[in-house]
Amino acid sequence: MSLIIPFFTRHRMSLSTMNTFILSASMLASLASAYTQVNVAKPFMEKNIDPIVFPGSFSKSHLHSFFGSDAVVASTKSSAELQAGCTGADNPNDLSIYWAPTVLYTADSGKTYAPVPVARFSAYYNLGETPAEIPIPQDLQMVAGDANAMTKDKMIASAASEWFCENDPASPLDVNGFPSKGCSSHLQQLLFFPQCVDPTTLKTAYKDRRGGACPAGMKSMPQLRFSIRYDLRKVLPKGWSGTAPVKLACGPAFCSHGDFINGWTEEAATNMVATTKEKQHFLPVTGGLKQKNCTPKDADPKHGVSDYAQSVAAMGKREVAAWGWESRTRLPRA
């Protein structure tokens, strides 16, 4: 089997790490399988809701950026709800909702913050994993990462969160986990979700290792991975050197996390399993839906806020120099 270095890896890899990668990739080559991918051009809304962690609330969640089905509201629970919406995804059979903490930048030394423009959101399924046993179940909800992690040692290792400058040589990260030098192209994030599920309880878990085994009583499903590209070149044209003028709505890069509620049609979810079996190829997921002529928009515009400062006020926070807010109480994982 020939070694194929994935596009997302080879364009950010320094020469000093190439040999290590080749050795690791050689051992994993026999495990590498096919994958599929869904792209969304941009979020259709930023909003201070979190249907998984704070269902129904408009005052407990920090600001998130939402991609996918616009049927999502603060109380969304099911695949059927999402499948009634309009999606920005390039596969009409994917009416899932994906969200992550809004990435913010400051151009005035922290006095104000605004969302960083998103160049592209991509949801990869099963990239580099072994074949899935079962489809992603209807109504599945998942969270990857930990919104409470304020230091690197508190991060969930299996989520494998990364921040780097796409196509640029590897550079040290700053004290907050972001690149310490401005990006010549996109600021990119990667985040892996659990790939094991109990189809009865819908509880999820990670395998014991990449390409390894699921916990007892669980089956493997196509693994979801977020790949989000942000474009800072217009809003911060001079870049930066040292501490990046960037943060997440939850804090530093260490609190990176993502949320997902499955909205794939049952037919398409079943068809996705077959795309994980052929070695090292992209395969499209087919289904019975055709692209709608619609534009995703906020389904509940009268509730919640999309402005960062207003979201901070809604949470009852106070501004601090380091991150723009400090919690009076420890928030649940989001």
Residue spans for each PLM region:
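Primary mode marks residue(s) on the alpha4-beta5-alpha5 output face of response regulator receiver
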Residues: Y35-K60, S65-L191, D198-A334
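Fungal secretory targeting signals
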Residues: M1-T36, P332-A334
